[in-house]
């Protein structure tokens, strides 16, 4: 998990991994504590830093499948480009208001995020989740579908959203 931010009250309605008691705590610390409380046998590695062009290749190198749940376009394109360069499969998800989208990239099996969307939109052309709002259940719906993409890839069963963009 890579996140530099702290838990904010506005996060709680859509990021159910955190609680009121976690406000002000580093998101990666709060999320790790919750996951370990649910399953003490899980191993959670956290990195409290922004993903940048300088560190992205190092951050993804040890993982078999990358899940992009970022909330900004520069990060989404950076993760896409790094995964394409490294030959890493990944799942993109995005949510805003009552809408969500999801796609999975597997090298050699379909287009990547940049292939579909070309370039990030101009700064301030699309409102942030904080500006536009997100219905909390949307994060759960899209997050669950994204988790299923990772599970399907890892176990080699089921049809992935490769070459398709699911919109909800």
Residue ranges and their predicted role:
Residues 3-168:
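Adenine nucleotide-associated cytosolic modules
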């Amino acid at each position: 998990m890579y996140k530099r931010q702290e838990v904010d009250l506005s996060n709680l309605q859509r990021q159910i991994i955190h609680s009121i008691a976690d406000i002000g705590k580093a998101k990666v610390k709060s999320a790790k504590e919750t996951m370990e409380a649910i399953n003490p046998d899980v191993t959670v590695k956290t990195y409290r830093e922004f993903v940048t062009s300088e560190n992205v290749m190092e951050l993804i190198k040890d993982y078999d499948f990358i899940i992009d749940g970022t909330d900004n376009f520069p990060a989404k394109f950076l993760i896409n480009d790094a995964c394409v360069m490294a030959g890493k499969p990944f799942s993109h998800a995005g949510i805003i208001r009552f809408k969500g989208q999801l796609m999975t990239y597997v090298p050699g099996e379909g287009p990547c995020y940049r292939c579909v969307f070309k370039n990030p939109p101009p700064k301030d052309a699309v409102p942030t989740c904080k500006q536009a709002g997100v219905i909390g259940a949307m994060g759960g719906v899209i997050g669950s579908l994204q988790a299923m993409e990772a599970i399907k890839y890892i176990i080699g069963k089921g049809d992935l959203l490769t070459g398709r963009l699911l919109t909800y």
